[in-house]
Amino acid sequence: MEITKEDKRSVIDHCYLTYFISGMVILIFGVILPNLIEERNLSFTAAGGLLSFLAIGNLCSSLVYPVFCGMMSQKMAVVVLAIPYPMCLFLFTLGLPVPVLYVMIFLIGITKGMITIINNHAIRQVTGSSNQYLNLLHMWYAVGFFLPC
């Protein structure tokens, strides 16, 4: 079934919005980290470990997402892997022990990586792998990241 021009535009716009919001959300950790260091007396090593676990989770999403898609539909995999994001962000505010923070930030990294995979895949699919739209997608991430600054 052929996708209409309006549907293509809708998918593209939603992907741009998602990346814009993703850029803003990742900035949250840059804002939260100094407060965590001060209030929880975290060492710079522990704080850097949190950022490392975010990056490791992001990398692991490339392995986890295809496995989930193989076990269930792609839409269900998106729902299952997106659920930890708001839960972990909320739990981050409760002052839990550092090892729990590592697990939560790892799950946030997996979810963030999954968002990247899905958005890139959707843009490639509806635009016929147009580099122009992929570049604009990543531009919206940067705008979302720097706009709150």
Residues of each region from the PLM?
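Pair of pore-lining "gating" transmembrane helices in MFS-fold secondary transporters
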Residues: 5-34, 38, 106-107
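Small-residue-rich segments within alpha-helical transmembrane domains of MFS-like 12-TM solute carriers
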Residues: 23, 27, 109-117, 146
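Residue-level signature of mid-helix packing/kink "hotspots" within the transmembrane helices
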Residues: 27, 54-63, 146
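Juxtamembrane helix-start elements in MFS-like secondary transporters
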Residues: 33, 37, 42-51, 134
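Conserved MFS/SLC helix-loop-helix module at the cytosolic interface between two early adjacent transmembrane helices
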Residues: 60-99
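Hydrophobic core of transmembrane alpha-helices in multi-pass small-molecule transporters
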Residues: 88, 99-114
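Intracellular juxtamembrane helix-capping segments at the cytosolic ends
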Residues: 113-127
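Glycine-rich segments within core transmembrane alpha-helices of 12-TM secondary carriers
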Residues: 130-149
